[in-house]
Amino acid sequence: MFIYDTKSKQKVPFEPLVKNKANIYVCGPTVYDDAHLGHARSAIAFDLLRRTLELSGYEVMLVRNFTDIDDKIINKALKENKSIQELSSIYIESYTRDLNALNVKKPSLEPKASEYLDAMVHMIETLLEKNIAYRVSNGDIYLDTSKDKDYGSLSVHNSSIEFGRIGLVQEKRLEQDFVLWKSYKGDNDVGFDSPLGKGRPGWHIECSSMVFETLALANTPYQIDIHAGGSDLLFPHHENEACQTRCAFGVELAKYWMHNGFVNINNEKMSKSLGNSFFVKDALKNYDGEILRNYLLGVHYRSVLNFNEEDLLVSKKRLDKIYRLKQRVLGTLGGINPNFKKEILECMQDDLNVSKALSVLENMLSSTNEKLDQNPKNKALKGEILANLKFVEELLGIGFKDPSAYFQLGVSESEKQEIENKIEERKRAKEQKDFLKADRIREELLNRKIALMDTPQGTIWEKFF
C-alpha cells in the first residue's frame, strides 16, 4: 500500500506503527452550517482510504471529530438566539444525514470538542509549565512558536509568509504564535470554568487533544499513523497541531499526513465568502446520494475537482453500466476476469488511484457483458460475478442497490403504479394487434423520461435523466 505523504511530498509505502493495524484521524466539520460539497469530498476520500486498507487486511480505527466550540458557532447561536449546544446539534444531525446518503461508513469514533475540555486544559497546562506557552494581558494564552525548531516543516511556512490570517495581537511575541485559550470576554462570549480561568480552547488545541485521548499510541515516535483532512487545513491548522504536539509530548503527531484537493464551482474555489457554496442537502434534492458519491470519487483525491452537472451526468453512465451488468447476472450469466479483485485493489493501494481503478472496472463491465452476449445460458459463474460486484460495493461504496431501485430513482410509488398500469395497457394492445396504441403508450412514457425494454421475462422500465 502506497500513500502520498504531504510532509515528505512523495508517495511512500504505508508502514503502520502496529502491524496490520491503521489508526487515522480525519478533521471533521465546524458545525455552524450545513455540509457543502467540500465536506462531502473529504469524507468520501478518506472513506475510500479506510475501505482500501480494510480490504487489504488492516484493522482500521478511524476517528472524525466535530468542532462544536468555535467563534462562528458562538456568533450564529447569538444571532439565532440559541445555545451553542442547540445550534451545533442541529448541524451534526444534518452532516450525519448527508454522509449516510453518500454511503460514507460511520467512523469508529466521532468525538465532539466540548467532550474533551479537561484534556485540552491539561495540554495547555503542560505547555505553560514548559514555558512554551504564555499569557497576554487580556488572559488569552498563546504558544511561542520560536520554541519549536520544526515549525513550518509540514506546510513549508515561515514567519515571512502571510500570518495575517491568524489574527494580529499586539502582545504576541511572533506573528505566527497562535492562541491556545481564549479568556471569557463578557456577556456575548462563551466560557467554561477551568484551572486556566474562565474561557474556551482555541481551534488547534481541540484536535491535538482529541487525537491524544482517542488514538495516540504510547512509546512510539508518532502518536498515530495518518492525520487527514482538506488541503485548506494544511496551514495554519495542521501545522499548529503538529507544533503543539511536539512541544507538549516530545513526539510527532502523525507518521503520515494526507490532504484532499479543493472543490471548485465554475472554476472558482468554493467558499462562503464568494457566495458559491453548494450544500450537500441541495445536491441531494436533484441527485441520489450514490450518483453524487460516484461523481465525487471519480477524480483523484489530491486533484482539484471542478464541479459541474454535465460531468456528473457523464459519470452516471459508469453507475448505469454496473447496474446493467448486475441486472443481467441476476438472470443469465457469463465468464469474467478472475484477477479483477486483485487488479482493482492494487490500483487503490497506489495512493487511491481511483482513475486507474475505474478503468479496470470499465474493462470488467465491458468484457463480462461481451461474454454474456456470447453465452447467455451459462450459470456456472453466477457467484463469482456477484462477488466481484460486491467487492466494488465494499471498495468504492457504489453499486449496492437493487438494479430496479437504481433505475427507478426519483419515481414516487403512485407514479410507479401508474407506469405499471400503462405497461399492462400496452401489453393488452399488443395482444389485440393494436400496435399503434402500443407505440403511442411507449412514446407517452418516453416523453416523461420513462424508457421501456421488452425482455423474455416481460417489459421492464427505467427513469432516465
Curated annotation (Swiss-Prot):
For the motif 'HIGH' region, give the residue ranges.
Answer: 29-39
CC cofactor:
Zn(2+)
Which Pfam families does the entry mention?
Answer: DALR_2 (PF09190), tRNA-synt_1e (PF01406)
The main enzyme category here is ligase
> Which Gene Ontology cellular-component terms appear in the entry?
cytosol
Keyword annotations of the record: Aminoacyl-tRNA synthetase, ATP-binding, Cytoplasm, Ligase, Metal-binding, Nucleotide-binding, Protein biosynthesis, Zinc
The Enzyme Commission number assigned here is: 6.1.1.16
Residue positions binding ATP: 272
Biological process (GO) annotations held by this record are:
cysteinyl-tRNA aminoacylation
The answer to whether UniProt assigns keyword Chaperone to this entry is: no
- Which cell locations does it reside in? Cytoplasm
Q: Which domain of life is it from?
A: Bacteria
Please write the reaction equations for the catalytic activity of this protein.
tRNA(Cys) + L-cysteine + ATP = L-cysteinyl-tRNA(Cys) + AMP + diphosphate
Summarize subunit and interaction data from the UniProt record for this chain: Monomer.
Q: Which family does it belong to?
A: Belongs to the class-I aminoacyl-tRNA synthetase family.
What name does this protein carry?
Cysteine--tRNA ligase
Taxonomy of the source species: Bacteria, Pseudomonadati, Campylobacterota, Epsilonproteobacteria, Campylobacterales
